[in-house]
Design a protein with these regions (language model features):
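Solvent-exposed alpha-helices and their adjacent loops that cap or buttress functional pockets
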Residues: 137-141, 225-226, 243
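TRNA-recognition modules of translation machinery and tRNA-sensing kinases, especially anticodon-binding
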Residues: 248
Length: 260
């Protein structure tokens, strides 16, 4: 993996306070946020842009995962088809390249959304994560690391070209690409976990919009928090579909190891 760091513009935190509040009172939430940012390991802060795969350091495809995407449920595969599947898989491994980006933000679980329900806000962004599942996942967290990864438009164009030449090869290529993006996300997540571990932190399990009751509508703002369109060419449509299609967006929470 090839890694470079882009400086992050730190915008001031804004909190709406009741008009009755003492203007001389200390903003404890802002102080806590500043403290969290000071204590956050630099390797996790980001944004960090990562290139994964390619001819020099190819990503490996999980063959069982690829077969699952093809709808395989254990039935026998004829030798000719098995060879064809393996040929396409090796081609995707050799030429597939993923771009990823991640950044970490302080978590604010102290506010309510417009409907008066508890929510998660990522300080320094316009991200509000709604839903009981994500609230339970992050309510005690100090930080949230947002990760995005994509195989890019070259993969999309290759898939379309194969569709015109050989629908079977296109189906295999599509399944192999789905397995490849899973591999890339695993590598990106491992980088975050390694950085957290080096700082005495551990990460909880990965979560994505669409899991449980966390709505897909949050994807656009999460990608904006990473400036993912400019950095890795990843965007989201008004119908919440990510483009390019072989892309993933997720988040995790690095926390002290002694956290209960």
């Amino acid at each position: 993996a090839h890694l470079h760091h882009e400086p992050t513009e730190r915008r001031p935190c804004r909190y709406e306070c009741p008009s009755s509040r003492d203007p001389l009172a200390v903003d404890t939430q802002t102080e806590a946020t500043s403290s969290n940012m000071r204590e956050l390991p630099g390797a996790l802060a980001g944004p960090r842009v990562v290139t994964l795969g390619g001819t020099e350091d190819p990503l490996a495809i999980d063959r069982n995962e690829m077969l699952r995407y093809l709808g395989h449920t254990g039935q026998n595969i004829e030798d000719d088809l098995a060879c064809r599947i393996e040929r396409v898989a090796r081609d995707v491994e050799a030429h597939g390249r993923a771009r990823g980006v991640f950044a970490t933000f302080p978590v604010d679980a102290s506010t309510l959304d417009d409907e008066g329900r508890a929510c998660i806000r990522l300080t320094g962004t316009v991200v509000t994560l709604r839903g009981r599942d994500i609230y339970r996942h992050l309510k005690d967290a100090r930080w949230c690391t947002v990760l995005a990864c994509t195989l890019g438009m070259d993969n999309e164009r290759r898939l379309r070209a194969l569709g015109a030449q050989s629908p079977l090869d296109a189906a295999i290529y599509d399944a192999a690409s789905s397995a490849l993006i899973e591999s890339a996300v695993g590598h990106l997540d491992s980088m975050v976990q390694d950085a957290a571990s080096a700082a005495g932190l551990s990460c909880n399990w990965r979560f994505s919009c669409g899991y449980g009751d966390c709505p897909l509508e949050a994807q656009g703002r999460l990608l904006a928090s990473l400036d993912a369109t400019r950095r890795i060419g990843l965007t989201v449509t008004p119908t919440n579909r990510m483009v390019p299609s072989k892309s993933c967006l997720l988040y995790t929470s690095p926390s002290p190891r002694d956290r209960s």
